[in-house]
Amino acid sequence: MRLIPLKNDQQVAKWAASYIAQRINQFKPSAERPFVLGLPTGGTPLQTYQELIKLYQAGEVSFKYVVTFNMDEYVGLAQDHPESYHSFMHNNFFKHIDIQAQNINILDGNTDDHQQECHRYEEKIKYYGKIHLFMGGVGIDGHIAFNEPASSLGSRTRIKTLTEDTLIANSRFFNNDISQVPKYALTIGVATLLDAEEIMLLITGYNKALALQAGVEGSVNHLWTVSALQLHERSIIVCDEPATQELKVKTVKYFTQLEAQEIASVC
């Protein structure tokens, strides 16, 4: 596992966006051989999307031959609802770049057959071979996508009941009214994520410090989904200084020295 400890969330966004653009450009995607990118929603990746839009506008990256798969979607929320993840992705990223509509994949939370929709999603990922780079974030309890604590580390795309902590955290998007937050979501599984060729998690803020500590220094544990990254041969966590508050000083020092060149690139 790589840990890139940066100063603040702006540096995290710049580094992550630059890394994604670099990976796409190195791949040299085409219509016959697209780059497959996994994407999250939520507050943490917003700045990264803004930085990616800037890189696109500067002509430094194109998404014409990029296929995307999103991590999750609420169940029962209309796709045009302002807080659906379809709306989030369109408004904050897709409408600002040159991605082709047919290359965008987001779970359908309004289908009558959730099991079939989840199976279809897994099969479509297999159709493309694999996800080359999956960017994600974590919740304060260490969940990735909607793989809440005690999710199986071998899980696949499925419907999940959201925990009270997640409902409370997400209520900020619903006028702080927890009763308006959908209680269920369709989500990729932990094993689906681990199938990716490379995983990059963004972890920022004091409230994510325990999750970062569990993911980096803790044992692999189904109560902390983030810890599953320890099993992946190409995983990166990009974090800011506030998120490192629960890490041992020697851990931060070790990775700061190890990743000095990467840290210098955004300072």
From Swiss-Prot:
Keyword entries, A-Z: Allosteric enzyme, Carbohydrate metabolism, Hydrolase
InterPro entries listed in its UniProt record: Glc/Gal-6P_isomerase, Glucosamine6P_isomerase, Glucosamine6P_isomerase_CS, NagB/RpiA_transferase-like
Active site: D72, D141, H143, E148
Enzyme Commission number, as recorded: 3.5.99.6
PROSITE patterns the record matches: GLC_GALNAC_ISOMERASE
One annotated GO biological process: N-acetylglucosamine catabolic process
Coiled coil: none
One MF term in the entry's GO annotations: glucosamine-6-phosphate deaminase activity
Stated regulation of activity: Allosterically activated by N-acetylglucosamine 6-phosphate (GlcNAc6P).
GO CC, one annotated term: cytoplasm
Catalyzed chemical reaction(s): alpha-D-glucosamine 6-phosphate + H2O = beta-D-fructose 6-phosphate + NH4(+)
Pathway: Amino-sugar metabolism; N-acetylneuraminate degradation; D-fructose 6-phosphate from N-acetylneuraminate: step 5/5
Site (Part of the allosteric site): S151, R158, K160, T161, Y254
Subunit structure comment from the entry: Homohexamer.
Family as reported in the entry's similarity comment: Belongs to the glucosamine/galactosamine-6-phosphate isomerase family. NagB subfamily.
UniProt protein name: Glucosamine-6-phosphate deaminase
Originating organism: Haemophilus ducreyi (strain 35000HP / ATCC 700724)
